[in-house]
């Protein structure tokens, strides 16, 4: 009965996420190691959350896709200016999701690309973007599918700046989003209601 609610992508092989990352990142550099560590942390939690949804709420979830998308969600950081996490590009860090989408779109990974674009914060609405004058497209960048929401939520429990720290508690993850306003907190709270404590 459990397996009937897990959606596995039977019509394709799982993609080689490490191979995709290595197209853009030099292996065993500080940035590569940080990205792999963070993405693996997020992927493990995202898989656990996905399976919990299947087991407790009997919701169909594409677990393979969740794992793949979690590994690739931050692929765009390489082009950003964030030296504290070894990123020496020119783009503002807030654009890493948009950049990641473009990278994965070019590879034909359109569904994975949307996760890149929609995982920042608890998603960004056009109102958030305009109010904060963010250097992003003027459109909603909100996680829509269940899988997108799982990866977005799981990402909030880990820090690239402090990759060796334990996963954040729900209250700490929520507190990190307070500065982004009530709408962001409301979206996070809805995800927390759906997915629970990590």
Pin down the residues of each PLM region.
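Amphipathic alpha-helical segments within well-ordered protein domains
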Residues: 22, 47-51, 100-105, 174
């Amino acid at each position: 009965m459990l397996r009937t609610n897990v959606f596995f992508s039977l019509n394709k092989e799982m993609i080689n996420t490490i191979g995709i990352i290595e197209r853009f990142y030099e292996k065993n550099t500080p940035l590569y190691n940080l990205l792999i560590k963070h993405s693996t942390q997020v992927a493990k939690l995202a898989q656990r959350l996905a399976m919990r949804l299947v087991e407790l709420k009997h919701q169909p979830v594409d677990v393979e896709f969740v794992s793949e998308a979690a590994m690739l969600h931050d692929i765009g950081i390489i082009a950003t200016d964030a030296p504290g996490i070894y990123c020496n590009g020119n783009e503002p860090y807030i654009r890493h999701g948009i950049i990641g989408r473009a990278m994965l779109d070019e590879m034909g990974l359109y569904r994975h690309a949307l996760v890149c674009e929609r995982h920042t914060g608890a998603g960004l609405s056009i109102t958030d973007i305009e109010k904060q004058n963010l250097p992003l497209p003027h459109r909603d960048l909100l996680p829509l599918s269940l899988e997108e929401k799982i990866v977005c939520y799981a990402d909030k429990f880990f820090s690239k700046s402090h990759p060796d720290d334990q996963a954040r508690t729900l209250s700490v993850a929520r507190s990190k989003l307070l500065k982004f306003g009530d709408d962001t907190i409301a979206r996070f709270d809805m995800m927390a209601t759906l997915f629970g404590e990590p």
